[in-house]
UniProtKB/Swiss-Prot annotation:
Protein name as annotated: Periplasmic trehalase
Gene, per the UniProt record: treA
Family: Belongs to the glycosyl hydrolase 37 family.
Enzyme Commission number: 3.2.1.28
Region called Disordered, residue ranges: 545-570
A cellular component term, taken from the record's GO annotations: periplasmic space
Alphabetized UniProt keyword annotations: Glycosidase, Hydrolase, Periplasm, Signal
Signal as UniProt keyword: yes
Entries under Gene3D superfamilies matching the protein: 1.50.10.10
Active site residues per record: D319 (proton donor/acceptor), E503 (proton donor/acceptor)
Length: 570
């Protein structure tokens, strides 16, 4: 059971109430230890709620170059006491806000710069990074925004000092490739724990991430573990798979055609699909000032509406992209919650198929049939509503205008990745991706240059893997090889020059990290490491594995087990 509430005396509460001039913030109980989760777990509050006006003032004062710094700071005493002191001191002559923060908070430490041994190959460098990126937070400090987890885990790197949901699947691919199945099992166990504790897998293990999830890759994680442990893994995590599905589908039973509820939407024809959603409509604590500035730049929209759409874009993993905006040059035109994403629905199709498989493994044929029926219904809805027949590619659906959107993005490859695409349509997507997104350094996220990081000219490791796997699933091996080879060459050239792997790459050429977005380019980097290892083994034969990218392009991809399109998608 999650440890009990932080108890305070009535006298203390009264004193704080007076100090705050009638403003008393409430605290929910939270765990300082990763204990067995239980149904009476209360949601811990994020720092913007715990610290109220102090949090707002510190972030608006821009005391730190990165707004995430103070969001990750740990109060040294009860936040109510700190707030009371702040109220009493802030108007005094000579008050120094930075000094007050330094006295009352423990700031996150900058990670030590990793200097790899000289002469390492790409594979050796990645294998050497796994222990460097591994963290254990079974116990955390009281009032820390970090949420404890029972097992160790691998973080992305750089400013990302916690585990992230969808990042982790691609990191786990690399861990498995390196033979670290124990770490894969630990990370799956952590996500299962989070589902039991919070009802879903949050964006990351921070209190300020609890109001949203991320692209649902838990089914893929369990399937990966099942490659090593067999159907026992499917049976073990069936309850958590069911809980995650319930989270995404919450409220579907009462929806009428044309209505939406949180993460689920019902179109006019009765088709059920999903969207990204954040339960809160305030600035993100980790990007507080930026979100306030974005909202102020568009006074024609309610700020709360913009905040929720910014948060929901963070839930999508694509924060930010022209994909979510009416005007690619104006972030305040973002409207994530009115868009039905093709990649999200492809992933939920996979979740339904995995639920069917896990139910069958557990001996529940009736449930397996129900999940198969749900998957088939979603596959039909994807083909009906998320296919742009005029352009010839999969795209997002616009709820505001009740029509398919025209923009081609790397998300168009997700139906191929989960084998939910019709074969003729897969061929059209392959041709479109090759013509419009394939660049010298890999697959571009979109063809739009907006200055946002999930747009051109950036390419991201997870999207390269999804594309390569999806194209292979439908026999588009030559295009798959081009994506794989070009991206690996980009990674190798950057590594040769800088001796590191980075979060994203400029794919308009090779050998350059990507730009744009809210923070500087990060290195490490979890998902790039994982995808690079998988791709190295994809282009080199099993009998002669390569430790670095070959200097010449292989004739074809190595034979690897891939998913076969189901009969419904032939």
């Amino acid at each position: 059971m999650i440890p009990p509430e932080i108890r305070r005396s009535v006298l203390l509460q009264k004193a704080i109430k007076l100090a705050l001039a009638g403003t008393l913030l409430t605290f929910a109980s939270f765990s300082a230890t990763a204990a067995d989760p239980s149904s009476d777990t209360e949601t811990p509050q994020p720092p913007d709620i715990l610290l109220g006006p102090l949090f707002n003032d510190v972030q608006n004062a821009k005391l730190f170059p990165d707004q995430k710094t103070f969001a990750d700071a740990i109060p040294n005493s009860d936040p109510l006491m700190i707030l009371a002191d702040y109220r009493m001191q802030r108007n005094q002559s000579g008050f120094d806000l930075r000094h007050f923060v330094d006295v009352n908070f423990t700031l996150p430490k900058a990670g030590e710069k990793y200097v790899p041994p000289a002469g390492q190959s790409l594979r050796e460098h990645i294998d050497g990074l796994w222990p460097v990126l591994t963290r254990s937070t079974k116990n955390v400090e009281k009032w820390d925004s970090l949420l404890p987890l029972p097992e160790s885990y691998v973080v992305p790197g750089g400013r990302f000092r916690e585990i992230y949901y969808w990042d982790s699947y691609f990191t786990m691919l690399g861990l498995a490739e390196s033979g670290h199945w124990d770490k894969v099992a630990d990370m799956v166990a952590n996500f299962g724990y989070e589902i039991d504790a919070w009802g879903h897998i949050p964006n990351g293990n921070r209190t300020y991430y609890l109001s949203r999830s991320q692209p649902p890759f838990f089914a893929f994680m369990v399937e990966l573990l099942a490659q090593h442990e067999g159907d026992d893994a499917l049976k073990e995590y069936l309850p958590q798979l069911q809980k995650e599905y319930a989270y995404w589908m919450e409220g579907v039973e009462t929806l009428q055609p044309g209505q939406q509820n949180q993460r689920v939407v019902k179109l006019e024809d009765g088709s059920v699909l999903n969207r990204y959603w954040d339960d809160r409509d305030t600035p993100r604590p980790e990007s507080w000032v930026e979100d306030i500035a974005t909202a102020k730049s568009n006074p024609n929209r309610p700020a709360t509406e913009i905040y929720r759409d910014l948060r929901s874009a963070a839930a999508s993993g694509w924060d930010f992209s022209s994909r979510w905006m009416d005007n690619p040059q104006q972030l305040s035109t973002i409207r994530t919650t009115t868009i039905v994403p093709v990649d999200l629905n492809a992933l939920l199709y996979q979740l339904e198929k995995t639920l069917a498989r896990a139910s069958a493994a557990a001996g529940d044929r009736a449930k397996a049939s129900q999940y198969d029926a749900l998957a088939n219904a979603r596959q039909k809805a994807i083909e009906m509503h998320l296919w742009n027949n005029k352009e010839g590619w999969y795209a997002d659906y616009d709820l505001q205008n009740n029509k398919i959107r025209n923009q081609l993005t790397a998300a168009a490859l997700f139906p191929l990745y989960v084998n939910a695409a019709a074969k003729d349509r897969a061929a059209k997507v392959a041709a479109a991706a090759q013509a419009h997104l394939l660049q010298p350094g890999g697959l571009a996220t979109t063809s739009v240059k907006s200055g946002q990081q999930w747009d051109a000219p950036n390419g991201w490791a997870p999207l390269q893997w999804v594309a390569a796997e999806g194209l292979q699933n439908y026999g588009q091996d030559d295009v798959a090889m081009e994506v794989t080879w070009r991206f690996l060459t980009n990674v190798q050239h950057t590594y040769d020059r800088e001796k590191k792997l980075v979060e994203k790459y400029d794919v308009s050429s090779t050998g350059t990290g990507g730009g744009g977005g809210e923070y500087p380019l990060q290195d490490g980097f979890g998902w790039t490491n994982g995808v690079t290892l998988k791709m190295l083994d994809l282009i080199c034969p099993q009998e002669k594995p390569c430790d670095s990218v070959p200097s010449t392009r292989p004739a074809s991809l190595s034979a690897t087990p891939t998913k076969t399109p189901s009969a419904a998608t032939q």
